Amino acid sequence: MATMTTTVEAQPVAEPSSMRSVPGTLNVPVAKFPPPSRKDLSVDAEEVASSIVEAFNSAVSKNDLSAVSSLFAQDDGFRLKSIAIDRTSEFRSPKAMHIDNLDQVLGVQFFFTLETKIGTGQGLARLTEVGDGQWKFFTFYTSLGELKGHEELINERRPKGVEHGGQVGRKNWAERREMASEYQNGADPTVVVIGAGQAGLTAATRLKMLGIEALLIDQNERVGDNWRQRYHQLVLHDPVWYDKLPYMDFPPSWPIFTPKDKLAQFFESYATLLELNVWTSTSITSADWDKKTQSWTVTVTRKKGDSTETRTLHPRHVIQATGHSGKKNVPDIKGMSDFKGSRICHSSEFSAALEEQGRLGKKAAIIGSCNSAHDIAHDFVEKGYHVTIVQRSTTHVVSSKAVSEIALGRLFHEGGPSVEDADLFLHGLPAPVQKAINIQTTKLCAKLDKDMLVGLNKAGFKTDMGSDEAGLLFKYFQRGGGYYIDVGAAKLIADGEIKVKQGQEISEVLPYGIRFEDGSELEADEIVYATGYQNMRTQSQIIFGDKVASKLQNVWGFNEESEMKTMWQDSGHPGFWFHGGNLAICRFYSKLLALQIKGLETGLYRYGDF
């Protein structure tokens, strides 16, 4: 027997598969662009930008909120001292451009630098013409870059590394690193980061660059095992230009789509070269918050060679960086324990299809129809199995070519803008505006992918265009899944090499197959549940228990203001933070998370101020 190894009010998300989302999230409304004004780009963007910046700074210096509001197409307010146009690159300089993705609504875009009482940062503005020659802010985005007096320890502020001259008993670099990473003699990290994947690594690195002691702990034996131990054929579906990590770029010969084992090696090198403190083979046994001291008591069990040690740490912050998902989602279906085939497991436990089984004509059923399901089905086909994907609802499918060339190609490509500029451009749009643009982007992707989508639907595989037809990005942000970025399995489905069982829930697992609610049956020697994961809070409950988890807010999705919920911000429990997402999201938001912690540590602000 096998064993289970803007100002528009947001509305509640509807139930259709294309609109399904994580619990508690709201469906982001679609912003309306200003009506088309000019028919050409004959605008002096420099003059327009300079004029509105001058007016903005004048109003702010006088604390004239009415004058500030008059510069916006919609009312808003800001606490800034001044802004200045950023002309450090052609990409950042003021330019006339279309802002609606349809080449209809002309606007002026420019990057700017900003200053507040406690810090400096960057911003991105898009202007729209509301009258003949009258320009106002359509979108206005600001991002904190540095805290005054607490700048990152990079470039001209990098550490010296060694003090030259005679010094009795001086330790060399390797000895100093060993001492620093062990936290002996009562030393404690300021932050404990749980998980050493892309989320944990980026958070710890950002904190290190701000001079904050952070310790990464991971239950795996090696950094990178969170990728290394996944299924055999896994390759990143996003292109290399989108996936860069902060402070350390991929080599110029790096492949466009990164194999999982190669990424694992890079993670291990990243942790070593950036001198991150990492304890692998380490698990939390208890974690308690002391309200009086505003600190945690975290007890961990750590394997070191043939021995095991128990350590107690007292950090002031804990970051859960175990991925933006929680416990694996395995439906409780009648008969699962009676399955007599060779394997039944969740996709997280699947390593590879077995070629010797494929040669015997074995049958595999994959429950689910998103990225992991397709990759695993693809692997089974290549090993000679008869394969069926069980698709219960619909899936958004887009080719990796469309993602690379259309969805991301404008910003992330060879010779494109820096990732810092591209990130600011990408995240510098309010979610409703981003959704409006993505509706158009999704249509362009579908046009490129027309033959692929027709082939899938003819084969019985049902596709959708995502929430409000906004495609991949909003499937990810509102649901955390529900999509497949095609790297080859779509053709296998269209050609009939991967069969599809569509639209039926499973009523029972049989000894050698599956029975559906309509009474039909599917033979299977192996069953893989590619059914995703539960909310990130479920992992919090496992690690920290109900006492902590009950105070945490729902994670992921959007709130009433169309902002992401709980991630990278106040979690509902002091000293507790969530961080996760793909490599690009971790790259961007890790800095904002680290700056919040630095601000708390330096007394620049307190819990509840942000």
What spans do the regions from the language model cover?
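Glycine-rich active-site loop/strand segments that organize a redox cofactor
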Residues: D76, R228-Q265, H396-T463
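A short, basic/flexible loop-to-alpha-helix module at the beginning of a structural domain
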Residues: H164-P189, I344-G361
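N-terminal Rossmann-like FAD-binding beta1-loop-alpha1 element of flavoenzymes
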Residues: E182-I217, C370-V381
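Flavin (primarily FAD) cofactor-binding/catalytic cores of flavoenzymes
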Residues: S143, K260-A365, S369-N371, H378, ...
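Short beta-strand edge/turn micro-motifs at domain boundaries
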Residues: V8-V28, D103, F111-S181
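Glycine-rich FAD pyrophosphate-binding loop
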Residues: V192, T205-H232, Y385-V398
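Short, low-complexity N-terminal intrinsically disordered segments enriched in polar/charged residues
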Residues: A2-L65, L71, E178-D188
